[in-house]
């Protein structure tokens, strides 16, 4: 066997790469025949029956009075609208069946594009990866000479960068210390001792309160009784004294 024949025999069979269709794509003859077949079958099997049923139902609703009619055209606008909606619904319902026919075509760019569109994951997003996975890549185990070049985790970097700043802080941030180290001791103490040394008021009994009210009442009554006597004495002294026509007391 010649070397050229041996090399040709070992070459793997080349698969034809199908490019996805673009905007200016020209369908092949097989694809055109499938288009015509889909158009005919969707009209006869889906659009026409659904459109006819919609028009009949609409005419029945108009005749029974559920739908109003136009004064000029009657029930024609509503029946025509129902027929158009049924036609479009039939075309849309047959779309999935037409796509399955294109997928069965071999060496068809349109069929290949449809098959690629129904894959679960595209090629640029391989399985097993997620956008919420760990950001830090796993570093493989290195030999002893390269062990120091491994990436340090963020937690240790953060602690090494910001761990030394605690020495420069003027006061201590730990909770175990009794007082800050950089703050002076000229802080006014809380008036706890004054509050404790203040005399506590004894509760007043009912008898003591009644006696106090009685004393207050007697003092008020005494003051009221003394005031008329004093006013009468002042009036008598004023009458005994000689006064002028203006009411002024004349001196002897």
Curated annotation (Swiss-Prot):
Biased composition (Polar residues): 7-17, 126-141, 170-184, 222-231
Any one Pfam family match given in the protein's UniProt record, by short name: OCIA
Gene Ontology CC: one annotated term: endosome
Biased amino acid composition, Low complexity: 155-169
Disulfide bonds: none
Compositional bias segments (type: Basic and acidic residues): 198-217, 232-245
Top-level taxonomic group: Eukaryota
Annotated ranges, domain OCIA: 1-112
Keywords: Endosome
Cell compartment(s), UniProt: Endosome
Region (Disordered): 1-21, 126-252
Keyword flag Ubl conjugation: no
InterPro entries in the cross-refs: OCAD1/2, OCIA_dom
Recorded family membership: Belongs to the OCIAD1 family.
Protein name, entry field: OCIA domain-containing protein 1
Organism whose genome encodes this protein: Xenopus laevis (African clawed frog)
Gene: ociad1
